[in-house]
Amino acid sequence: MQSLFRSIPAIDKLLKTSQGADLIQQFGHQAFVAQARLLIEQARQHIQQHQSLPDFLQTEHTLFNELTHRLQSLAQVKMKPVFNLTGIVLHTNLGRGLWSEQAISAATSAMRNNVALEFDIEAGKRSHRDLYVSELLQQLTGAEAACVVNNNAAAVLLMLATFAQGKEVIISRGELIEIGGAFRIPDIMAQAGCKLVEVGTTNRTHLKDYRNAINENTAFLMKVHTSNYQIQGFTSSVSEEELVALGQEFNLPVISDLGSGSLTDMQALNLPAEPIMQQKVASGVDLVSFSGDKLLGGPQAGIIVGKKAFIDQLQQHPLKRVLRCDKVILSGLEATLRHYLFPDRLTDELPTLHLLTQSLDCLQHKAERLKVALSKRLDYRYLLQIEPSEAQIGSGALPTEKIPSLAVTISADKQSDLLELEKQFKTYPNPIIARFAQQKMWLDVRSVAEFEVLIFMLEEL
Protein backbone atom coordinates (compact mmCIF):
# COMPACT_ATOMS: atom_id res chain seq x y z
CA MET A 1 0.00 0.00 0.00
CA GLN A 2 2.92 2.34 0.70
CA SER A 3 3.95 2.12 -2.94
CA LEU A 4 0.46 3.26 -3.89
CA PHE A 5 0.69 6.26 -1.60
CA ARG A 6 4.07 7.11 -3.11
CA SER A 7 2.35 7.26 -6.51
CA ILE A 8 0.43 10.35 -5.43
CA PRO A 9 2.27 13.36 -6.90
CA ALA A 10 3.26 16.31 -4.75
CA ILE A 11 1.58 19.62 -5.48
CA ASP A 12 4.97 21.25 -6.13
CA LYS A 13 5.57 18.72 -8.88
CA LEU A 14 2.20 19.48 -10.47
CA LEU A 15 2.95 23.19 -10.36
CA LYS A 16 6.14 22.71 -12.36
CA THR A 17 4.56 20.80 -15.24
CA SER A 18 3.56 22.48 -18.50
CA GLN A 19 -0.04 21.28 -18.00
CA GLY A 20 -0.08 22.79 -14.53
CA ALA A 21 1.29 26.08 -15.84
CA ASP A 22 -1.45 26.18 -18.49
CA LEU A 23 -4.18 25.59 -15.91
CA ILE A 24 -2.73 28.24 -13.60
CA GLN A 25 -2.69 30.67 -16.51
CA GLN A 26 -6.35 29.91 -17.19
CA PHE A 27 -7.82 29.59 -13.68
CA GLY A 28 -5.28 31.13 -11.31
CA HIS A 29 -2.79 29.73 -8.78
CA GLN A 30 -5.14 29.56 -5.76
CA ALA A 31 -7.92 27.69 -7.55
CA PHE A 32 -5.44 25.22 -9.07
CA VAL A 33 -3.78 24.44 -5.73
CA ALA A 34 -7.13 24.11 -3.93
CA GLN A 35 -8.46 21.58 -6.45
CA ALA A 36 -5.16 19.70 -6.55
CA ARG A 37 -5.25 19.31 -2.76
CA LEU A 38 -8.83 18.01 -2.88
CA LEU A 39 -7.86 15.53 -5.57
CA ILE A 40 -4.84 14.31 -3.63
CA GLU A 41 -6.91 13.85 -0.47
CA GLN A 42 -9.52 11.87 -2.42
CA ALA A 43 -6.73 9.72 -3.86
CA ARG A 44 -5.46 8.96 -0.33
CA GLN A 45 -8.95 8.00 0.84
CA HIS A 46 -9.49 5.77 -2.20
CA ILE A 47 -6.20 3.94 -1.62
CA GLN A 48 -7.03 3.50 2.07
CA GLN A 49 -10.45 2.02 1.30
CA HIS A 50 -9.76 0.02 -1.87
CA GLN A 51 -6.00 -0.66 -1.85
CA SER A 52 -5.80 0.58 -5.44
CA LEU A 53 -5.21 3.78 -7.37
CA PRO A 54 -8.30 5.78 -8.41
CA ASP A 55 -8.93 5.97 -12.16
CA PHE A 56 -7.88 9.61 -12.37
CA LEU A 57 -4.42 8.75 -11.00
CA GLN A 58 -3.56 6.02 -13.51
CA THR A 59 -1.49 8.39 -15.67
CA GLU A 60 -0.40 12.00 -15.67
CA HIS A 61 -2.81 12.56 -18.56
CA THR A 62 -5.84 11.26 -16.63
CA LEU A 63 -4.83 13.31 -13.59
CA PHE A 64 -4.73 16.57 -15.51
CA ASN A 65 -7.93 15.70 -17.35
CA GLU A 66 -9.65 15.38 -13.97
CA LEU A 67 -8.13 18.62 -12.70
CA THR A 68 -9.20 20.43 -15.87
CA HIS A 69 -12.74 19.10 -15.57
CA ARG A 70 -13.03 20.19 -11.95
CA LEU A 71 -11.68 23.65 -12.59
CA GLN A 72 -14.01 24.13 -15.53
CA SER A 73 -16.94 22.98 -13.36
CA LEU A 74 -16.09 25.66 -10.81
CA ALA A 75 -16.54 28.33 -13.46
CA GLN A 76 -19.84 26.97 -14.79
CA VAL A 77 -23.12 28.39 -13.49
CA LYS A 78 -25.24 25.53 -12.17
CA MET A 79 -28.55 27.33 -12.68
CA LYS A 80 -28.56 26.60 -16.39
CA PRO A 81 -31.40 27.25 -18.88
CA VAL A 82 -33.83 24.37 -19.41
CA PHE A 83 -36.58 23.67 -21.91
CA ASN A 84 -39.95 23.59 -20.16
CA LEU A 85 -42.11 20.95 -21.87
CA THR A 86 -44.20 20.17 -18.80
CA GLY A 87 -47.28 21.99 -20.08
CA ILE A 88 -47.17 24.32 -17.06
CA VAL A 89 -46.39 27.75 -18.47
CA LEU A 90 -45.63 29.48 -15.16
CA HIS A 91 -43.72 26.63 -13.56
CA THR A 92 -42.54 27.78 -10.12
CA ASN A 93 -39.68 25.27 -9.99
CA LEU A 94 -38.48 26.40 -13.41
CA GLY A 95 -38.51 30.12 -12.63
CA ARG A 96 -42.09 31.09 -13.56
CA GLY A 97 -42.59 33.77 -16.21
CA LEU A 98 -40.08 34.94 -18.80
CA TRP A 99 -39.24 38.60 -19.16
CA SER A 100 -39.94 40.57 -22.31
CA GLU A 101 -37.03 41.77 -24.43
CA GLN A 102 -37.70 45.33 -23.26
CA ALA A 103 -37.60 44.27 -19.61
CA ILE A 104 -34.36 42.36 -20.17
CA SER A 105 -32.83 45.38 -21.88
CA ALA A 106 -33.91 47.72 -19.07
CA ALA A 107 -32.57 45.38 -16.39
CA THR A 108 -29.28 44.86 -18.24
CA SER A 109 -28.85 48.61 -18.61
CA ALA A 110 -29.42 49.01 -14.87
CA MET A 111 -26.77 46.37 -14.18
CA ARG A 112 -24.20 48.18 -16.29
CA ASN A 113 -24.93 51.74 -15.24
CA ASN A 114 -25.77 53.99 -12.37
CA VAL A 115 -29.46 54.88 -12.54
CA ALA A 116 -31.78 57.44 -10.97
CA LEU A 117 -32.99 54.91 -8.41
CA GLU A 118 -33.69 57.31 -5.55
CA PHE A 119 -32.80 60.57 -7.26
CA ASP A 120 -35.04 63.22 -8.81
CA ILE A 121 -33.00 64.43 -11.78
CA GLU A 122 -35.04 67.59 -12.35
CA ALA A 123 -35.13 68.67 -8.71
CA GLY A 124 -31.61 67.48 -8.03
CA LYS A 125 -32.55 65.83 -4.75
CA ARG A 126 -33.36 62.48 -3.21
CA SER A 127 -36.51 60.72 -4.40
CA HIS A 128 -38.21 57.36 -3.69
CA ARG A 129 -37.21 54.13 -5.43
CA ASP A 130 -40.82 53.06 -6.08
CA LEU A 131 -41.65 56.35 -7.79
CA TYR A 132 -41.60 55.31 -11.46
CA VAL A 133 -43.44 52.02 -11.01
CA SER A 134 -45.88 53.70 -8.64
CA GLU A 135 -46.80 56.29 -11.26
CA LEU A 136 -47.39 53.54 -13.82
CA LEU A 137 -49.46 51.44 -11.43
CA GLN A 138 -51.62 54.43 -10.55
CA GLN A 139 -52.27 54.98 -14.24
CA LEU A 140 -52.96 51.32 -14.98
CA THR A 141 -55.09 50.41 -11.95
CA GLY A 142 -56.74 53.65 -10.90
CA ALA A 143 -55.18 53.37 -7.43
CA GLU A 144 -53.95 56.42 -5.52
CA ALA A 145 -50.48 55.01 -4.86
CA ALA A 146 -48.36 51.86 -4.98
CA CYS A 147 -45.57 50.09 -3.14
CA VAL A 148 -43.23 47.32 -4.33
CA VAL A 149 -41.41 44.63 -2.33
CA ASN A 150 -39.57 41.48 -3.37
CA ASN A 151 -42.50 39.01 -3.57
CA ASN A 152 -46.20 38.76 -2.79
CA ALA A 153 -45.69 36.89 0.49
CA ALA A 154 -43.51 39.82 1.56
CA ALA A 155 -46.28 42.21 0.51
CA VAL A 156 -48.76 40.39 2.74
CA LEU A 157 -46.25 40.34 5.61
CA LEU A 158 -45.63 44.08 5.27
CA MET A 159 -49.35 44.91 5.28
CA LEU A 160 -49.99 42.74 8.32
CA ALA A 161 -46.98 44.06 10.26
CA THR A 162 -47.87 47.68 9.49
CA PHE A 163 -51.54 47.64 10.37
CA ALA A 164 -52.23 44.59 12.54
CA GLN A 165 -49.32 43.97 14.90
CA GLY A 166 -50.80 43.02 18.26
CA LYS A 167 -54.30 43.13 16.79
CA GLU A 168 -56.78 40.82 15.10
CA VAL A 169 -57.34 40.15 11.40
CA ILE A 170 -60.63 38.65 10.28
CA ILE A 171 -60.51 36.21 7.37
CA SER A 172 -62.77 33.49 5.99
CA ARG A 173 -61.80 29.96 6.98
CA GLY A 174 -62.09 28.96 3.32
CA GLU A 175 -59.33 31.43 2.37
CA LEU A 176 -56.57 30.22 4.69
CA ILE A 177 -54.42 29.15 1.80
CA GLU A 178 -51.10 27.35 1.70
CA ILE A 179 -48.78 28.30 -1.14
CA GLY A 180 -45.66 26.48 -2.32
CA GLY A 181 -43.17 25.10 0.16
CA ALA A 182 -45.77 24.68 2.94
CA PHE A 183 -45.94 28.48 3.33
CA ARG A 184 -49.27 29.36 4.90
CA ILE A 185 -51.23 32.57 5.43
CA PRO A 186 -51.63 31.79 9.17
CA ASP A 187 -47.84 31.44 9.46
CA ILE A 188 -47.32 34.85 7.86
CA MET A 189 -49.82 36.33 10.31
CA ALA A 190 -47.93 34.81 13.22
CA GLN A 191 -44.66 36.29 11.96
CA ALA A 192 -46.33 39.70 11.67
CA GLY A 193 -47.42 39.50 15.31
CA CYS A 194 -51.15 39.59 14.67
CA LYS A 195 -53.96 37.27 15.70
CA LEU A 196 -55.90 35.34 13.10
CA VAL A 197 -59.67 35.29 13.53
CA GLU A 198 -61.29 32.66 11.32
CA VAL A 199 -64.93 33.10 10.38
CA GLY A 200 -67.41 30.93 8.51
CA THR A 201 -66.70 27.40 7.36
CA THR A 202 -64.48 25.94 4.67
CA ASN A 203 -67.19 26.08 2.01
CA ARG A 204 -69.55 28.83 3.21
CA THR A 205 -68.90 32.24 4.75
CA HIS A 206 -71.50 35.02 5.10
CA LEU A 207 -71.25 38.74 5.78
CA LYS A 208 -72.77 38.22 9.23
CA ASP A 209 -69.81 36.00 10.13
CA TYR A 210 -67.45 38.93 9.64
CA ARG A 211 -69.80 41.31 11.45
CA ASN A 212 -70.08 39.06 14.49
CA ALA A 213 -66.28 38.78 14.79
CA ILE A 214 -65.56 42.53 14.80
CA ASN A 215 -64.45 44.01 18.12
CA GLU A 216 -62.35 46.88 19.44
CA ASN A 217 -59.14 44.94 18.68
CA THR A 218 -59.92 44.29 15.01
CA ALA A 219 -57.25 45.76 12.71
CA PHE A 220 -58.84 45.06 9.33
CA LEU A 221 -60.88 42.67 7.23
CA MET A 222 -58.91 40.49 4.82
CA LYS A 223 -59.86 38.82 1.57
CA VAL A 224 -57.54 36.21 0.01
CA HIS A 225 -58.02 34.93 -3.52
CA THR A 226 -57.83 31.14 -3.44
CA SER A 227 -55.74 31.00 -6.58
CA ASN A 228 -54.23 27.53 -6.11
CA TYR A 229 -57.41 25.61 -5.27
CA GLN A 230 -61.15 25.88 -5.81
CA ILE A 231 -64.12 24.88 -3.67
CA GLN A 232 -67.15 23.84 -5.69
CA GLY A 233 -70.70 22.77 -4.90
CA PHE A 234 -72.56 24.13 -1.87
CA THR A 235 -70.54 27.31 -1.41
CA SER A 236 -70.93 30.93 -0.42
CA SER A 237 -68.42 33.75 -0.07
CA VAL A 238 -68.44 37.48 0.55
CA SER A 239 -67.41 39.90 -2.20
CA GLU A 240 -64.95 42.75 -1.81
CA GLU A 241 -67.79 45.25 -2.28
CA GLU A 242 -69.70 43.76 0.64
CA LEU A 243 -66.61 43.74 2.83
CA VAL A 244 -65.85 47.36 1.93
CA ALA A 245 -69.35 48.42 2.96
CA LEU A 246 -68.97 46.56 6.26
CA GLY A 247 -65.52 48.04 6.80
CA GLN A 248 -66.82 51.55 6.25
CA GLU A 249 -69.58 50.92 8.77
CA PHE A 250 -67.00 50.07 11.45
CA ASN A 251 -64.21 52.33 10.14
CA LEU A 252 -62.05 49.30 9.30
CA PRO A 253 -59.80 48.98 6.24
CA VAL A 254 -60.20 46.05 3.84
CA ILE A 255 -57.14 44.35 2.37
CA SER A 256 -57.19 41.91 -0.55
CA ASP A 257 -54.44 39.46 -1.52
CA LEU A 258 -54.90 38.39 -5.14
CA GLY A 259 -51.86 36.14 -5.37
CA SER A 260 -51.51 36.18 -9.15
CA GLY A 261 -53.94 38.79 -10.40
CA SER A 262 -53.89 40.43 -13.80
CA LEU A 263 -53.83 43.87 -15.39
CA THR A 264 -55.76 42.69 -18.44
CA ASP A 265 -58.96 40.73 -19.05
CA MET A 266 -57.87 37.13 -19.57
CA GLN A 267 -61.25 36.20 -21.06
CA ALA A 268 -60.68 38.72 -23.85
CA LEU A 269 -57.63 36.60 -24.74
CA ASN A 270 -59.76 33.42 -24.74
CA LEU A 271 -58.22 32.35 -21.45
CA PRO A 272 -59.92 31.48 -18.13
CA ALA A 273 -60.96 34.48 -16.04
CA GLU A 274 -58.59 35.77 -13.36
CA PRO A 275 -59.23 38.70 -10.97
CA ILE A 276 -58.44 42.03 -12.61
CA MET A 277 -56.60 44.63 -10.55
CA GLN A 278 -58.59 47.57 -11.87
CA GLN A 279 -61.85 45.98 -10.72
CA LYS A 280 -60.52 45.28 -7.24
CA VAL A 281 -59.35 48.87 -6.85
CA ALA A 282 -62.72 50.12 -8.11
CA SER A 283 -64.50 47.97 -5.50
CA GLY A 284 -63.14 50.31 -2.83
CA VAL A 285 -60.66 47.92 -1.22
CA ASP A 286 -58.02 49.91 0.65
CA LEU A 287 -55.02 47.78 -0.35
CA VAL A 288 -54.58 45.04 -2.96
CA SER A 289 -51.47 42.90 -3.41
CA PHE A 290 -50.39 40.68 -6.30
CA SER A 291 -47.32 39.08 -7.88
CA GLY A 292 -45.04 40.49 -10.54
CA ASP A 293 -43.80 37.17 -11.95
CA LYS A 294 -47.07 35.38 -12.58
CA LEU A 295 -49.69 36.55 -15.08
CA LEU A 296 -48.23 40.05 -15.09
CA GLY A 297 -45.25 38.58 -16.94
CA GLY A 298 -42.43 40.41 -15.19
CA PRO A 299 -39.80 39.90 -12.48
CA GLN A 300 -40.49 38.50 -9.04
CA ALA A 301 -42.06 41.26 -6.97
CA GLY A 302 -44.88 41.87 -4.53
CA ILE A 303 -46.97 44.79 -5.73
CA ILE A 304 -49.34 46.67 -3.43
CA VAL A 305 -51.76 49.29 -4.77
CA GLY A 306 -54.42 51.26 -2.96
CA LYS A 307 -55.21 54.33 -0.88
CA LYS A 308 -52.32 56.77 -0.51
CA ALA A 309 -52.74 57.14 3.26
CA PHE A 310 -52.16 53.41 3.69
CA ILE A 311 -49.37 53.16 1.11
CA ASP A 312 -47.51 55.99 2.85
CA GLN A 313 -47.57 54.02 6.11
CA LEU A 314 -46.21 50.94 4.32
CA GLN A 315 -43.36 52.99 2.88
CA GLN A 316 -42.39 54.21 6.36
CA HIS A 317 -42.37 50.79 8.04
CA PRO A 318 -38.87 49.40 8.83
CA LEU A 319 -39.73 46.15 7.04
CA LYS A 320 -40.10 48.03 3.77
CA ARG A 321 -36.34 48.56 3.63
CA VAL A 322 -35.75 44.91 4.46
CA LEU A 323 -38.07 43.78 1.68
CA ARG A 324 -37.37 46.42 -0.96
CA CYS A 325 -36.38 45.65 -4.56
CA ASP A 326 -33.10 46.63 -6.18
CA LYS A 327 -32.54 48.70 -9.30
CA VAL A 328 -32.50 45.65 -11.59
CA ILE A 329 -35.91 44.36 -10.51
CA LEU A 330 -37.47 47.82 -10.51
CA SER A 331 -36.13 48.52 -14.01
CA GLY A 332 -37.48 45.21 -15.31
CA LEU A 333 -40.83 45.79 -13.60
CA GLU A 334 -41.16 49.30 -15.00
CA ALA A 335 -40.49 48.03 -18.53
CA THR A 336 -43.03 45.23 -18.02
CA LEU A 337 -45.71 47.63 -16.81
CA ARG A 338 -45.15 49.90 -19.81
CA HIS A 339 -46.34 47.09 -22.07
CA TYR A 340 -49.78 47.46 -20.52
CA LEU A 341 -50.02 51.01 -21.85
CA PHE A 342 -50.29 49.34 -25.28
CA PRO A 343 -52.78 46.50 -24.65
CA ASP A 344 -53.16 45.51 -28.31
CA ARG A 345 -49.50 44.38 -28.35
CA LEU A 346 -49.44 42.40 -25.10
CA THR A 347 -49.57 38.90 -26.59
CA ASP A 348 -46.77 39.74 -29.02
CA GLU A 349 -44.42 41.32 -26.49
CA LEU A 350 -45.00 39.48 -23.19
CA PRO A 351 -43.68 35.89 -23.43
CA THR A 352 -46.11 34.52 -20.83
CA LEU A 353 -49.19 35.81 -22.63
CA HIS A 354 -47.71 34.79 -25.98
CA LEU A 355 -47.27 31.18 -24.85
CA LEU A 356 -50.74 31.04 -23.31
CA THR A 357 -52.48 32.37 -26.43
CA GLN A 358 -50.78 30.27 -29.13
CA SER A 359 -53.29 28.73 -31.54
CA LEU A 360 -53.65 24.97 -31.90
CA ASP A 361 -52.51 25.29 -35.53
CA CYS A 362 -49.29 26.87 -34.31
CA LEU A 363 -48.85 24.14 -31.71
CA GLN A 364 -49.51 21.43 -34.31
CA HIS A 365 -46.69 22.80 -36.47
CA LYS A 366 -44.33 22.85 -33.48
CA ALA A 367 -45.30 19.34 -32.40
CA GLU A 368 -44.64 17.95 -35.88
CA ARG A 369 -41.19 19.54 -36.03
CA LEU A 370 -40.35 18.33 -32.53
CA LYS A 371 -41.44 14.80 -33.39
CA VAL A 372 -39.20 14.75 -36.47
CA ALA A 373 -36.21 16.10 -34.52
CA LEU A 374 -36.68 13.57 -31.73
CA SER A 375 -37.21 10.62 -34.08
CA LYS A 376 -33.72 11.17 -35.49
CA ARG A 377 -32.23 10.77 -32.02
CA LEU A 378 -34.28 7.91 -30.53
CA ASP A 379 -33.91 4.23 -31.38
CA TYR A 380 -36.43 1.45 -32.04
CA ARG A 381 -37.40 1.16 -28.36
CA TYR A 382 -39.42 4.37 -28.44
CA LEU A 383 -42.77 5.17 -30.07
CA LEU A 384 -43.45 8.84 -30.79
CA GLN A 385 -46.94 10.26 -31.29
CA ILE A 386 -48.65 13.66 -31.32
CA GLU A 387 -51.56 13.73 -28.89
CA PRO A 388 -53.99 16.30 -27.44
CA SER A 389 -52.79 17.65 -24.12
CA GLU A 390 -54.04 19.94 -21.38
CA ALA A 391 -51.72 22.75 -20.36
CA GLN A 392 -51.98 24.87 -17.23
CA ILE A 393 -51.13 28.46 -16.37
CA GLY A 394 -49.28 27.38 -13.23
CA SER A 395 -47.94 29.17 -10.13
CA GLY A 396 -51.27 28.71 -8.40
CA ALA A 397 -53.28 30.55 -11.05
CA LEU A 398 -56.58 28.83 -11.97
CA PRO A 399 -55.56 25.30 -10.92
CA THR A 400 -58.78 23.66 -12.12
CA GLU A 401 -58.72 25.32 -15.55
CA LYS A 402 -57.01 23.56 -18.45
CA ILE A 403 -55.84 25.08 -21.71
CA PRO A 404 -56.04 22.93 -24.86
CA SER A 405 -52.59 22.00 -26.10
CA LEU A 406 -50.60 19.40 -28.02
CA ALA A 407 -47.74 17.18 -26.97
CA VAL A 408 -45.29 14.75 -28.46
CA THR A 409 -45.67 11.60 -26.37
CA ILE A 410 -42.97 8.97 -26.03
CA SER A 411 -43.82 5.44 -24.94
CA ALA A 412 -41.76 2.27 -24.57
CA ASP A 413 -42.37 -1.37 -23.73
CA LYS A 414 -40.17 -0.98 -20.68
CA GLN A 415 -40.61 1.86 -18.21
CA SER A 416 -36.90 1.59 -17.50
CA ASP A 417 -36.25 2.75 -21.07
CA LEU A 418 -38.33 5.89 -20.47
CA LEU A 419 -36.47 6.58 -17.25
CA GLU A 420 -33.20 6.14 -19.12
CA LEU A 421 -34.40 8.64 -21.73
CA GLU A 422 -35.40 11.11 -19.02
CA LYS A 423 -31.87 10.92 -17.61
CA GLN A 424 -30.45 11.42 -21.09
CA PHE A 425 -32.59 14.53 -21.64
CA LYS A 426 -31.21 15.98 -18.42
CA THR A 427 -27.63 15.67 -19.67
CA TYR A 428 -28.26 17.92 -22.68
CA PRO A 429 -26.60 21.39 -22.73
CA ASN A 430 -30.06 22.78 -21.97
CA PRO A 431 -31.91 19.93 -20.22
CA ILE A 432 -35.38 18.96 -21.44
CA ILE A 433 -37.94 18.81 -18.63
CA ALA A 434 -41.08 16.81 -19.46
CA ARG A 435 -43.93 15.26 -17.49
CA PHE A 436 -45.04 11.65 -17.04
CA ALA A 437 -48.64 10.44 -17.28
CA GLN A 438 -50.39 7.28 -18.50
CA GLN A 439 -47.01 5.49 -18.65
CA LYS A 440 -45.77 7.96 -21.28
CA MET A 441 -43.43 10.90 -21.39
CA TRP A 442 -45.31 14.04 -22.48
CA LEU A 443 -43.49 16.90 -24.20
CA ASP A 444 -46.11 19.67 -24.24
CA VAL A 445 -45.19 22.33 -26.78
CA ARG A 446 -47.33 25.13 -25.33
CA SER A 447 -45.01 25.79 -22.41
CA VAL A 448 -41.68 25.76 -24.23
CA ALA A 449 -40.00 29.06 -24.99
CA GLU A 450 -37.10 29.38 -27.45
CA PHE A 451 -38.56 26.58 -29.56
CA GLU A 452 -36.13 27.18 -32.43
CA VAL A 453 -33.20 26.81 -30.03
CA LEU A 454 -34.65 23.48 -28.85
CA ILE A 455 -34.88 22.16 -32.41
CA PHE A 456 -31.37 23.39 -33.22
CA MET A 457 -29.98 21.67 -30.12
CA LEU A 458 -31.62 18.35 -31.02
CA GLU A 459 -30.34 18.53 -34.58
CA GLU A 460 -26.78 19.43 -33.57
CA LEU A 461 -26.27 16.95 -30.73
From Swiss-Prot:
Subcellular location per the Swiss-Prot or TrEMBL entry: Cytoplasm
MF (Gene Ontology): L-seryl-tRNA(Sec) selenium transferase activity
| GO BP terms, alphabetized | conversion of seryl-tRNAsec to selenocys-tRNAsec; selenocysteine incorporation
Gene Ontology CC annotations of this record: cytoplasm
Please state the pathway this protein functions in, per its UniProt record. Aminoacyl-tRNA biosynthesis; selenocysteinyl-tRNA(Sec) biosynthesis; selenocysteinyl-tRNA(Sec) from L-seryl-tRNA(Sec) (bacterial route): step 1/1
Keywords of the record, alphabetical order, are: Cytoplasm, Protein biosynthesis, Pyridoxal phosphate, Selenium, Transferase
**Positions carrying N6-(pyridoxal phosphate)lysine:** K294
The cofactor required is:
pyridoxal 5'-phosphate
Q: Enzyme class, one word?
A: transferase
Protein name as catalogued:
L-seryl-tRNA(Sec) selenium transferase
The protein's organism comes out as Glaesserella parasuis serovar 5 (strain SH0165)
The taxonomic lineage of its organism, from the top, reads: Bacteria, Pseudomonadati, Pseudomonadota, Gammaproteobacteria, Pasteurellales
